[in-house]
Amino acid sequence: MAELLAIKWDDNRDKLILLDQTILPNKIEYIEYDTAEGVYDSIKDMIVRGAPAIGVTAAYGLYFAAKVAPEDNFENFFKYLKEKSAYLDSSRPTAVNLSWALKIMESKALENKDKDVKEIKGILREEAKRIHEEDIEICKAIGENLITLLKDGVGILTHCNAGQLATSKYGTATSPMYLAKEKGWNFKVYSDETRPRLQGSTLTALELYEAGIDVTTITDNMAAMVMSQDKIDAVIVGCDRIAANGDTANKIGTMGVSILAKYFGIPMYIAAPTPSIDINTKTGKDIPIEERNSEEVTSRFGVWTAPKGVKVYNPGFDVTPHENITAIVTEKGIVYPPFEENLKKLFEK
């Protein structure tokens, strides 16, 4: 069984290599990128997906923009960089890691504005690589914190893909699963298929299966059943953005899972890199929710599954109320309610 990585960097050829997640699990193919425009398309078309992976990819995308930016003076260079940053930021509006990574790249350019533009381009290359490596370290630390809340023999339910395929490595929600596997634990994972794009069955189930982890795929409407049968001891999901009060935007269907978990008395854990926490967003009502193409709902594998022309509502995300969340687990530690107070403390450390 092979390790699947969503993002690879070819240092010798200066190319970003992304796993095409739109054709999984039927084919495993990688696509090479070396332009900001290509990176934009990869994010928009969900070749790469998952908030952390999107952020890392965008950082490389802005480096590619910097490579072809004007070199006559810093002002013209930075103007071009800002334009391309806004362009990349528009590819997926919900994932806060996207704007976070782009702002870091912009700040790094400003910090070095007195240097030669050619030198700044090299600095941005190294900064994108640093963001990539940092994501790996963050994911492992999240797993190390999460595993303290679990025990051998645990049954875990997860929704969508907050796994290795959504990050640089380990994943967020799946990180404790990989670490538990290394420890020799016996445990089971139930993966919601996650309509309409099926990330749970095509991505999460695939990567866990390839890693030799005991994973069972269920349809989204089976979650209540497996909870009622005492198969689930913990729900662990990722996030795309967390508001200051703890409200959490994640893949559509997560809110429903949280309601079920609360009803059955099952702890609901959010695996969250700190870049996904947006202290400037007061509540979940302030988080922009992306609406996606209607055909994601009405057709599958080239076959119509609903009447052509029928009205479709297809939000890509929903917001889990903070009241339904047991803890938010970050690389810096575990955050318990009251979230508005304790999330602030997290950034004071």
UniProtKB/Swiss-Prot annotation:
It holds the Pfam family IF-2B. Keywords: Carbohydrate metabolism, Isomerase. One of its GO terms (molecular function) is S-methyl-5-thioribose-1-phosphate isomerase activity. HAMAP family: Deoxyribose1P_isomerase, Salvage_MtnA. GO terms for biological process: L-methionine salvage from methylthioadenosine; pentose catabolic process. The keyword Isomerase applies. This is 5-deoxyribose 1-phosphate isomerase. Substrate binds at R49, G50, A51, R92, Q199, N250, K251. It is an enzyme of class 5 (isomerase). Catalyzes the isomerization of 5-deoxy-alpha-D-ribose 1-phosphate to 5-deoxy-D-ribulose 1-phosphate, as part of a 5-deoxyribose salvage pathway that recycles this toxic radical SAM enzyme by-product to mainstream metabolites. Belongs to the EIF-2B alpha/beta/delta subunits family. DrdI subfamily. It comes from Clostridium botulinum (strain 657 / Type Ba4).
